[in-house]
């Protein structure tokens, strides 16, 4: 059977509730559970020719910035997919059979900062188990965070403090890797959202700039 997203062949199988066959491969379903939007599930680093393959050999975080529509989220999604694939654990379900199974790590999350801000606002106005601190801790402590679209939120002292708290938690934690995208350069981020945030990102991240016109309009 062929995955409807990435096109790879995978064995026929019935989903857990038995209602219908799978239409996506295990990797694409896993990525979707980790928060990656459907439209980015098939993103591949093969789409980029800028030497980012060396990023996988480093332990550095990454800050990707550029204008609207230059492919920042697509690139970040490709890095997430490739990182999960390269760290997968392969094993044989039965030593007497040649069939190989694979387990993908779960210590990855994809989220946009506007989504985090929305969750925090919702926690203040409803009776949920989530609070500001639990939301920040969730994304601040996961080993691999793919944080999309920082700087898109309207700047306020409160949201600046939330963003700084999150970045600081990731910067000071052990073995925490972060990939961040923004329409703003670090200088612009400092002007609009505070120097502390921009300084911490510069400290922890390699910087990649994507240039060009809006690909969505071409």
What residue spans do the PLM features occupy?
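Short glycine-rich substrate-engagement loop in P-loop NTPases that contacts/grips substrate
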Residues: 84-141, 157
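Residue-level preference for the first positions of well-ordered beta-strands
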Residues: 61-63, 107-108, 144, 177-179
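A short, basic N-terminal segment
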Residues: 1-54, 207-208, 212, 218
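Short, well-ordered alpha-helix to beta-strand connector turns
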Residues: 59, 142-143, 204-205
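GG-anchored amphipathic helix commonly corresponding to the ABC/SMC/Rad50 NBD signature/C-loop
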Residues: 77-85
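Walker A/P-loop nucleotide-binding motif
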Residues: 59-78
